[in-house]
Design a protein with these regions (language model features):
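Short, small-residue-biased leader/transition segments that mark boundaries at the very start
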Residues: 2-4
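Active-site-proximal glycine-rich helix-loop-beta segment
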Residues: 8-10
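A ligand-binding cleft/hinge motif common to bilobed small-molecule-binding domains
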Residues: 12-30, 110
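Short beta-strand->loop
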Residues: 30-43
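A bilobed periplasmic-binding-protein/Venus flytrap-type ligand-binding module shared by bacterial periplasmic
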Residues: 45-61
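Secondary-structure end/capping motifs
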Residues: 57-140
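Conserved C-terminal helix/tail region of periplasmic/extracytoplasmic solute-binding proteins
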Residues: 128-166
């Protein structure tokens, strides 16, 4: 959405820290960035979702995909040029300036490499953080614990032993 183009001081827009603040600034609008994590929201920003049947029937393929994804993040952060060329090929509207901003923000905030990832590996998911996220959603009455059990919402089996360290 281009809500920022209206320059309404009461407008809000949800977005990615690596993208929307850059676009808003490029549009000449001064904006404040508020992080959900700063407000106590413990959930992971991005996870890999997969159907239960796929995990059961094609677990090796899922494991390979997860591993390649984590290694891809490590490679991208070490040398973004090859991936950026592919991004620009598929999205001709993408600029070098936007990509540089995104990589800088990823690194500055430790979005893929900070927190538990620094010692446990990129893409790590912990039981403690999954429980904190679940409890937050239960407390906010967004999940009914009688209908949704924590143990059925995630698995660490594909990431716990990967240790793709930054």
């Amino acid at each position: 959405s281009d809500v920022y183009k209206r320059q309404d001081k009461n407008a809000a827009q949800q977005g990615y820290l690596t993208s929307e603040p850059f676009a808003i600034a490029k549009a000449g609008v001064k904006a404040n960035t508020l992080m959900f994590s700063d407000q106590g929201y413990p959930a992971y920003a991005t996870t890999i979702s997969c159907m239960e049947k796929t995990v059961k029937d094609r677990g090796a393929a899922v494991a390979s995909f997860v591993k390649a994804s984590m290694e891809g993040w490590k490679s991208y952060l070490a040398d973004p040029a090859p991936a950026n060329a592919l991004i620009k090929k598929d999205n001709p509207n993408m600029t070098d300036e936007q990509l540089a901003y995104s990589v800088a923000k990823l690194k500055e905030m430790g979005m893929a490499t900070g927190g538990d990832a620094a010692t446990m590996g990129i893409g790590i998911m912990t039981d403690a953080r999954a429980k904190a996220s679940y409890d937050f959603l239960v407390d906010a009455k967004l999940i009914d614990p009688a209908k949704v059990k924590l143990a059925e919402t995630y698995t660490t089996s594909f990431v716990k032993d990967l240790k793709v360290l930054p």
